[in-house]
Structures are given as C-alpha cells and as structure tokens.
C-alpha cells in the first residue's frame, strides 16, 4: 500500500503574550513561533482495513482516539468520505508535555500527509481550518513558516526576515499540563499595546523580543526552570526563555559551535534532556 514518511518539527516561542481571557474559556494570545529541527518521525500507510490506527510505543502517548494524530487522520477521512484505512507510526523524539508542540506538530504532519496520500487536494488554508478544531498550535505547523500568531494561535502572519540561529533545548524531564498553566495564570490587566517587529537581522534582535507571560506561573511550581535559564546564560547563550507552557527552556546562540559547546557542557553536569538544534527558516 502507499506510504509516506515525514518529519514533524518542534517549535519554540520567541514571544508569548497572554492578552485576555475569552468568553469561551480560551485566551487571546500574541506569539512569535519558530520551528526547530528537533523532529518526530511520522509514517503514514494506507490500508485495506478501514479505520485509523496509531502506534507509538512511547510512555504517556496514547495510541487511540485520545491521540491528536489519530483525530487528525479521522477528520480527513470523514471529509473525504472514503472507506480506506490509515496506519500511523510515530517515532517520538520531541519530549512530551514540554511546551514544544510535539503533539500539535504530529497532527499537522498527519493532515499534510493524508491529504497527499489520498489525493484530496485540500489547500493549506483548508487544512489550517481543520487543524484549529484539533488544537490551537496545529495551524502553525500546517502553515510551516516562522510566524506571528494571534487569536488563540490560528491567525498567522509570516515573519520572513529571521536569522538562522542555533538553539540549545533543555528539558528537565518533568511533564507540565498546559491546561494547568493557563488555569493558574493571574491576568493583571489589558495588554499594553506594544508592537512586535517583523524583521530580525541577528540574535540580538531576537533576544530583544524574548518574553513569556506563562513563565512566572510554571517557574513558581518548578524552580528548576530558573536554574536552567541561568545555566544557559552562563554557558554563553545570548538569551534564554521558557517555551510555551514549559518546562522546556531554550537558549539562543549565533553559531553552531557555540550551541554545541554549551549543550555538551550542560549535558556533562546534569541528567536533563539537552540538544543543540537549528531554527528552521
């Protein structure tokens, strides 16, 4: 049967502003979202046996309808009206519940792959519409570019001028619930109205916009996040920030040599998940 293997990249947030709580329980956000080359691997195979099947083998990642990748494939099957089966094998390299968007990226990759395998011809815009019904970050991964994300994350504007930075990703091997972080967030007032530039020429420009309104919530419960930020800066990072709802922290570096040296230094003195990666631009 026809099969396709694709990479599903993680993301970091160079910026995450929580603007206000919405009547529907979600929050209006303003984010700068950047894909990185830490990737899960997704193999999608068409099958004679109807229905969707997901296998992963990673603790904490469900295989059935609770898996967002399963729901992505099922949504496109329902749209297509076809009776074919879809088998999805996920090799997880992105830490789970880490603020890196691994599940959302898997779902977006399944949308793109199933659309291609079944020859549905759905546009990126239509796939993004399907994606937002699955999760707020899914449209960004379908979009496939560095972006300013607004609304709940589904209103996307491409940021084309981004330097090819290197990052060191550090995860303390603690899962954090995104729902808990947002429930614990204490909004102090309306957004102050500052603007975000759309052009970044170097690492200093990116460091100038680093901010995450969720960081104080997560760091209060998991102080190790603050320790990781300090370790990254001490290892030479131009800036460091928690990604998404955490607990993963990233440090920004201007060169591969600096990033790999810092990653090795932190790996040698901790039992954390540490990796040097490129920003995908």
From Swiss-Prot:
One molecular function GO term is:
ATP binding
Keyword Lipid biosynthesis attached: no
Residues annotated as the enzyme's active site: 11, 137
Q: Record-annotated residues binding ATP?
A: 95-105
Q: Which reaction does it catalyse?
A: 4-CDP-2-C-methyl-D-erythritol + ATP = 4-CDP-2-C-methyl-D-erythritol 2-phosphate + ADP + H(+)
The answer to whether keyword Protein biosynthesis applies is no
Q: In which pathway does it act?
A: Isoprenoid biosynthesis; isopentenyl diphosphate biosynthesis via DXP pathway; isopentenyl diphosphate from 1-deoxy-D-xylulose 5-phosphate: step 3/6
Q: What class of enzyme is it?
A: transferase
Gene3D superfamilies, alphabetized: 3.30.230.10, GHMP kinase, C-terminal domain (3.30.70.890)
EC annotation?
Answer: 2.7.1.148
Keywords carried by this UniProt record: ATP-binding, Isoprene biosynthesis, Kinase, Nucleotide-binding, Transferase
GO-annotated biological processes: isopentenyl diphosphate biosynthetic process, methylerythritol 4-phosphate pathway; terpenoid biosynthetic process
Q: Function of this protein?
A: Catalyzes the phosphorylation of the position 2 hydroxy group of 4-diphosphocytidyl-2C-methyl-D-erythritol.
Family stated for the protein in its record: Belongs to the GHMP kinase family. IspE subfamily.
Q: What is this protein called?
A: 4-diphosphocytidyl-2-C-methyl-D-erythritol kinase
Source organism of this protein record: Geobacter metallireducens (strain ATCC 53774 / DSM 7210 / GS-15)
Name of the coding gene:
ispE
């Amino acid at each position: 049967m026809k099969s396709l293997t694709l990479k599903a990249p993680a993301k970091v947030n160079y910026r995450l502003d929580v603007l206000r709580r919405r009547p529907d329980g979600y929050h209006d956000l303003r984010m700068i979202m950047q894909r990185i080359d830490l990737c899960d691997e997704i193999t999608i195979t068409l099958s004679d046996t109807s229905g969707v099947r997901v296998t992963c083998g990673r603790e904490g990642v469900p295989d059935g309808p609770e898996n967002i990748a399963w729901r992505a494939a099922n949504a496109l099957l329902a749209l297509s009206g076809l009776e074919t089966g879809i088998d999805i094998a996920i090799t997880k390299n992105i830490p789970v519940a880490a603020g890196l968007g691994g599940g959302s990226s898997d779902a977006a990759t399944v949308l793109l792959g199933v659309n291609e395998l079944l020859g549905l011809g759905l546009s990126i815009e239509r796939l993004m519409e399907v994606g937002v019904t699955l999760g707020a970050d899914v449209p960004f991964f379908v979009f496939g570019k560095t972006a300013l994300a607004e609304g709940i994350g589904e209103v996307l504007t491409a940021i084309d001028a981004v330097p090819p930075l290197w990052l060191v990703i550090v995860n303390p091997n603690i899962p954090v619930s995104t729902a808990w972080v947002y429930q614990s967030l204490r909004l102090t007032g309306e957004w102050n109205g500052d603007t975000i530039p759309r052009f970044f020429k170097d690492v200093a420009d990116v460091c100038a916009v680093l901010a995450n309104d969720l960081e104080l919530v997560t760091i209060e419960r998991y102080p190790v996040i603050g320790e990781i930020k300090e370790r990254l800066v001490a290892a030479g990072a131009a800036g460091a920030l928690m990604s998404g709802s955490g607990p993963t922290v990233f440090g920004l570096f201007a060169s591969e040599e600096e990033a790999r040296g810092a990653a090795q230094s932190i790996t040698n003195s901790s039992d954390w998940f540490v990796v040097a990666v490129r920003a995908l631009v």
